[in-house]
Each structure stands twice: as structure tokens, then as C-alpha cells.
């Protein structure tokens, strides 16, 4: 028997999606190097590879993230929408990059409850 390795869903928290204008320099350096070719940047810019087979996606980000611009999440959601892949996105007004569970910012911490509801809505558990 063969098992599919395609994920049933993706959960993206302040994701790095773009290797061009809205890149996170540290991620780009670690993934493709300082002197990456244009083709490498294209390959690692995930919004350019969304297809109707992309799994449903839950995204959250903060608009004040100074490390990874919120445009990364917006670009990915736009790409999902264009091929009619189901997604839910939450953009919170405050919060730095790397908040984890965000317990120190109650308004942002609600992402966990939203995720749980999304998982149930999509019959993932």
C-alpha cells in the first residue's frame, strides 16, 4: 500500500512566502544563499506555486511584524483565492514576529481558538 505524503491542511503562522520584495533576509540567506539566482527565488516564493491541489490553509500574522512583512500572508491568501483553495486568515493589528502562542497578547492569543474551530470545520480531527 502506498500512502499519500500530501498534507491534509497547512497551518501558517507569520510565514515567509516571498523571496523578492517582501522577503525575510535571514530566511532567504538560509534557504537559497546570498547570491541566489532569480530561478531559485522563484522556486522558493511559495505563492507562485499554489494550485487547485494545494491543501486548505489556516494563516495568521500581525500587521506590525517587523521581521516578516504581513504582505507574505496576504500574497499567499490571494494566490489561494485565485485557484479557489479554501483558507482562513487572521491579521492582528499588534504583535511582533515569533509570538508563539501569543499568551501575553490576549487579542492575538485567540488565534488558537480560531484554529481549533477551523480544524473541526474542515473535519481534520
Regions found by a protein language model. Name each.
Residues 19, 64-68:
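Acidic catalytic loop of the alpha/beta-hydrolase fold
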Residues 34-49, 54-55:
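Active-site nucleophile elbow and catalytic-triad environment of alpha/beta-hydrolase enzymes
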Residues 53, 58-61, 65:
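Short beta-strand/loop motif that positions the catalytic acidic residue
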Residues 6-9, 54-56, 83-88:
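Loop/turn elements at helix/coil->beta-strand transitions in domains of secreted/extracellular proteins
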Residues 10-14, 60, 92-93:
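Alpha/beta-hydrolase-fold catalytic nucleophile elbow
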Residues 70-125:
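C-terminal catalytic histidine-bearing segment of alpha/beta-hydrolase fold enzymes
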Residues 1-26, 41-42, 118:
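Primarily recognizes the serine-hydrolase "nucleophile elbow" in alpha/beta-hydrolase
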